[in-house]
Amino acid sequence: MLVEDVVILDFETTGLNPDRGDRVTEVAALRIRGNRIVESFESLVNCSVRVPDYISQFTGITQAMVDAAPAPALVIRQLLQFIGDDAVIAHNAGFDQLVLDSECRRLGLVNPLPDFICSVLIARCMFPDMKSHALGCLASHLGIPFAPGAHRAAVDATVTANILFRACDLIRTRFAVPRIDASVLRRIACAAQMAEISSAAISAA
């Protein structure tokens, strides 16, 4: 059980390269308190760009849905207000951080949030025997409901939250940590990242 609030964040986008013009189509943020979701923020986003057909097929987010959505100037500010001072956790956090940084720059804002905590790294530390730590693979391994082909922001964020709950249970028992907060999660993610760096260095030697 977490002893402080954290926010699970997920973006859907028009592609994987925000620095090359890919934009947000949807965002979801879930506030976690203890071992449950207590509050949520969710919105489609109209960035006045074309949604590629393959993205619509992948996510179910159509051009018409995006065209009818509020502009990023509103959504991003609402998102930052929702998050407040809470730590942010995301699956493949580097991507979500890049997306938010890019959208903030476009609005003339500085992203005020500290580095996100990556749930992929936490999962690699807590479930080391898995060959893949993709969201769907983790959900299947842990028995968490996750509809095949579901790639909407709120669905992905909810699955990430449930994976985090399972990871926290393991952290508490495996490491005898009675109070799990964002600093504990950040240390575990950093340890997993350093282990990967060490393995890569050894392999390259």
Residue ranges and their predicted role:
Residues 1, 161-205:
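Acidic two-metal-ion nuclease catalytic site recognized across multiple nuclease folds
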Residues 1-114, 128-129, 133, 137-151:
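Conserved non-catalytic scaffold segment of RNase H-like nuclease domains
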Residues 113-124:
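A short, structured active-site edge motif that brings together acidic residues
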Residues 122, 138, 159, 163-166:
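Generic recognition of well-ordered alpha-helical segments
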Residues 155:
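Acidic donor-binding loop at a coil-to-helix junction in glycosyltransferase catalytic cores
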